[in-house]
Amino acid sequence: RDSSTSRGLGDVYKRQGYAPVENPEIRIGRNTKDFGNGFYCTIIKEQAQRWAKRYDTKIVSIYDVRLNSALQIKEFKEMTDEWLDFIIDCRSGKKHAYDIVIGAMADDQIYNYVSDYMDGSITREQFWVLAKFKYPTHQINFCTKEALKCLEYRGFEEVL
């Protein structure tokens, strides 16, 4: 291992179907994402499996991660106003300077509340009342090519 790695996250899972992803790459899509463009994974295996079940071929790719302390890493340890503002900025198309962003995911239901807040339909306080998760969520976005070097492909599992 490279001496510049500071901490490992252990296994992370790519929440997608179709086929294993041995060589991760930054995806730039039409739709804006919580933490901007990048390669999204999670440390919660069950979450990745739930996402994979949306596809005909239900595949979860598995990686080992060693974070490089030289990279710009932003971690949201909990859902806070800063987390919400960051998601709103990213979903609005604003760029950020981080290589890796880690934190809770605004799933479909939560994103509806984010949209309502952005539209002024609900207040920030109302957002937080509505934003209680049924189960915890987690995401890591590898935003740059340098960040992708922290990932080592270990294999995949088919979700039944």
Where are these regions (language model features)?
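Single conserved hydrophobic/aromatic residue that forms the stacking wall/gate
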Residues: 1-13
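Extended catalytic/binding region for NAD+/ADP-ribose chemistry, centered on the ART fold
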Residues: 30-53
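Short aromatic-glycine-(Arg/Gly/Cys) micro-motifs in beta-strand/loop hairpins
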Residues: 11-33
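Generic detector of short alpha-helix boundary/capping microenvironments
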Residues: 1-2, 26, 36
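Conserved NAD+-utilizing ADP-ribose enzyme module
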Residues: 7, 21-23, 34, 54-160
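Aromatic side chains
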Residues: 13-14, 35, 39-40, 63
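Residues immediately flanking
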Residues: 16, 45, 65
